[in-house]
UniProtKB/Swiss-Prot annotation:
Subunit record text: Forms a heterotetramer with UvrB during the search for lesions.
Protein name (database record): UvrABC system protein A
Zinc fingers (C4-type) by residue: 284-311, 768-794
Misc note: This bacterium is considerably more resistant to UV and gamma irradiation than E.coli; the E.coli-like SOS regulon model is not an appropriate model for DNA repair in this cyanobacterium.
Matching PANTHER family: UVRABC SYSTEM PROTEIN A
Protein's gene: uvrA
Chief subcellular location: cytoplasm
Listed SUPFAM superfamilies: P-loop containing nucleoside triphosphate hydrolases
Amino acid sequence: MPEQNSIRIRGARQHNLKNVNLDLPRDRLIVFTGVSGSGKSSLAFDTIFAEGQRRYVESLSAYARQFLGQLDKPDVDSIEGLSPAISIDQKSTSHNPRSTVGTVTEIYDYLRLLFGRAGSPHCPHCQRNIAPQTIDQMCDRVMELPDRTKFQILAPVVKGKKGTHVQLLSSLVSQGFVRVRINGEVRELSDNIELKKNQAHTIEIVIDRLIKKEGLQERLVDSLSTCLKQAEGTAIIDILDKPTLAVLDGGKKDDKEALKAAENGQAYHAELPKEIIFSENFACPEHGAVMDELSPRLFSFNSPYGACPDCHGIGFVRSFCPDLVIPDPEKPVYVAIAPWSEKDNSYYLSLLYSLGQHFDFQLQTPWKKLTKEQKEIILYGTEEEIWFEGESRYRNKQGYYRRFAGALNILQKNYDETNSDAIKQKLEKYIINQPCHTCGGKRLKPEALAVKLGQYNINNLTSVPIRQTLERIENLELTSRQAMIGELALKEIKARLQFLLDVGLDYLTLDRAAMTLSGGEAQRIRLATQIGSGLTGVLYVLDEPSIGLHQRDNNRLLATLTKLRDLGNTLIVVEHDEDTIRHADYIVDIGPKAGIHGGEIVCQGDFQTLLKNQRSLTGAYLSGREAIATPEERRNGNGAKLTLQGCCHNNLRNIDVTIPLGKLVCVTGVSGSGKSTLVNELLHPALQHYLSRQVAFPKNLGEITGLQAIDKVIVIDQSPIGRTPRSNPATYTGIFDSIREIFTQTIEAKARGYKPGQFSFNVKGGRCEACAGQGVNVIEMNFLPDVYVQCDVCKGARYNRETLQVKYKGHSIADVLAMTTEEALTVFENIPRAVNRLQTLVDVGLGYIKLGQPAPTLSGGEAQRVKLASELSRRATGKTLYLIDEPTTGLSFYDVHHLLNVLQRLVDKGNSVLVIEHNLDVIRCSDWIIDLGPEGGDRGGKIMVAGTPETVAQHPSSYTGKYLAKVLQS
């Protein structure tokens, strides 16, 4: 391969890579594949991308480098032919609640620009178009009235204010005005006008009374000028008497001039407004709603100029949840309010007692037996003042009249005003995020939401699925001026929306919080953004872009990757998806297995080369030499079932779902069809509410039945098992407790009186204090990356010399942490409690990982399997429900085979497993399928079919069934 057309890697030894030498073609779509933990990410991200990023950063000044997070130099001899590198992975999803799909893709920035420059402001109260008008424009509008129309010009000086307004009326007389209109009635100022003090009044000066005719303009301009001066820029044209109009199709015909006008084809007016309101200000003439001059910042929820004043642009507020404050409605009133049921609550008891006296309930009455009104009074307070009697906070006997603020408001005040972290922490468990009442979750202030472009405000474009947003943008009803101003912004918005459609994200909305996106969705959004940038000559490194994507949408993703390549870029894609592997220009298979058994280039070349390679596990499954067998029989389950009724959250359309227990159940459907909503946002919280009462029951779920068949619910996801190097597989699974106990039984440990704490690297005693048990010391280098230096005292062993002198079968505690699971299984083969947990790690395919491997270095798939192993080693109750969201993420065909064996074992032990999955191997091996659809977003949310894989495969309208039928036949 010519040097200039290739990326040449020599001596790559990062992590488990074994001195890899590799030449990769430029401007091609390259797929790195292999089993989980084989070294794919180590080569793609930690070597190739890291070196490309490091070289770019090193080209900057030392001053600039101190502001950039730098990557360490990877362990590689050389990389030649490297282009500027951009990483698109799953780990960099924003956790900022202010970040949305619109802001990440920058579409929202263009929308802000568009509305700020071409928008049309309206009154937030009456939706009247707000625009400043000159006197000439006002005069022209009045002169459009039919001839002989009688009208009067009014200057509103008081709008709905209480008072007698004696001074104002006296002032008007002295200025020479004759009449005023008060509360809709015209009165002479010479009359003795007496207004009620406690009543709201509207007062308008009658400036002039006129009849529309030719030659009226000069007097009209003078009168309007006087009116605008008196009413601070506002004028009202009150139509007093409409002229008789001629209508040729029928009606009055006694006006000869009108008839003549009609016969000559001149315009005539069938309807006239009762009033015409003018304003020379940027304000609503009726409600006085003032609009600042439009600018993009008015539409930014991250700016004080545009953000909702109550939620500050987040869209939700943190407030106390009634379901958490009253977790058990069976309890009597005096202990039902959980935060008040703890010790020293006599003050609150006296409040409740007084409320009971006034509103006729007993403190011993169960909460659920109170009337709706009584419950609302206790929670939200009273408008009227009532008599309270009892001890004050300071133990003084007293009585007084006052309003009761309500338990929720009292708790909120206590939380907001306390300086005690302990009190805040205690109250936090009763607080949830709830949509802001002021903006309804729209994030913006009313003035911003009242600005329209064509027929839509900005929320009308961001709150609907992207597919619908594009339709609305293309059908905007714009004036020629608006179209000219917005031409470039509209072009950019349409292009970026189309890119999102191309990667299968048509069901998302632009106002969707980025923190709620799955890893696959976030990655495809960044992929769409990169296509929009139009860069060429770039090296893109992607991590499984097909995650969370239904088989139906794969072709759209592949077309996007091809488009990015055809722009003149090189793509390295870490992927396990068969369609992507087949579509690749060049394939690199890394393995043959994981960890110390991997790190080699097993195969490189095209798809046919991969199929023929006898060492490649990927090739073995793709060629059919290895296969995951479809179960011959489907389980009947244990007869129990969970039934969710009235599911209407997000896009779910008030569906009823039945989940059989004692089975492996798959929830399937295209991306955005409602799978995660059903399982993660309805089923899981409902189960938590039932089991612990520490989570509110989902508002958009009618009811759930069959809960007595479940005593534990466990979510197994791909989040890290720990955030620090102190956490590792040994500590997470509990193996380390057994190992430390074993070491205390040695002769040396007994002689020294060592307890299990001596062998912990987290507490003082046996650990090395020079590095606090970490094995390394961190040295901050300012504009260079932090350097991790092996501890000089313990040489990375984590323990002090005395602890390391204690040996079991010739191995110190540090030696054991450095062992792989397989090696440890041999060492502790005679210790049943250790063997049980170690064997489950081997069974889930993690025989290669070290017991002390820091948690942050584990892949998502590895972390998930550590959790599965931990669950497998526990004694089964037969009433546990496992919820697993896309467990095949990051797993090869070989790993999926292992995973399925583990899931089947969990079910065989009497448990129930519910999986959200797109992988057809997992779906066809399940006992029951619940398929949602038919499409994503607002076109999804229905149950297409529920039944065995064979039943689903026969359904004519199910996309899942269509692809499932093919694999079942093969």
